[in-house]
Regions:
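Extended beta-strand/beta-hairpin segments
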Residues: 2-47, 58-167
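Alpha-helical metal-binding/catalytic segments enriched in His/Glu/Asp
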Residues: 52-53
Length: 167
């Protein structure tokens, strides 16, 4: 299932992402010349894996009628001082004493199935390109218009995707 997110440039460094019926606002902290009026894009990225983990715990509990009132979940990202793109996402869950060992294991295993985590671990490929018309291009994407002769450049690779496959 594919989702298009359209971004609008607002005042100063504020941005607005629109998808489905939702709008998300991002800003930058004051130290980065923003107003600090909203989380930054990377903050949303970090929040997405914590929320995904909690969602999978919630699903596990719902199907087994386990109350989530006293379950607490937290995520910390530990950044490698040598390489800030090398990070450990540590997800910690605090569970009430009355939860069985079986359910404790089950909850940890369900967090492991989190979609955000799985996509990040698989290492998504980013295709960055200019288009003449976003709306027309989105339409072509939906109808899988394979009749285009456009070359798709993947950042970090020299040859267009089509030629890389051909080689």
């Amino acid at each position: 299932s594919h989702m298009e997110i359209k971004v609008n440039f607002l005042d100063k460094l504020r941005l607005e992402a629109k998808f489905d019926d939702f709008t998300v606002i991002a800003d930058q902290p004051i130290r980065y010349k923003g107003d600090g009026s909203a989380p930054g894009p990377f903050d949303y990225f970090l929040a997405s894996s914590a929320l995904c983990a909690a969602y999978f715990v919630k699903l596990y509990c719902e199907t087994r009628n386990i109350p989530t009132d006293n379950i607490r979940l937290s995520q910390n990202n530990i950044v490698d001082p040598e390489n800030r793109y090398q990070q450990i996402f540590k997800i910690q869950v605090e569970l009430p004493v009355d939860i069985s060992a079986k359910d404790r294991q089950g909850m940890l295993r369900s967090i492991d199935r989190c979609t955000v985590k799985k996509v990040v671990q698989a290492g998504p490929e980013f295709v960055i390109e200019e288009v003449e018309n976003l709306d027309a291009d989105a339409q072509a994407l939906l109808t899988h218009n394979a009749a285009t002769n456009a070359f798709t450049f993947i950042a970090g690779k020299d040859l267009p995707l089509e030629q890389t496959i051909a080689n």
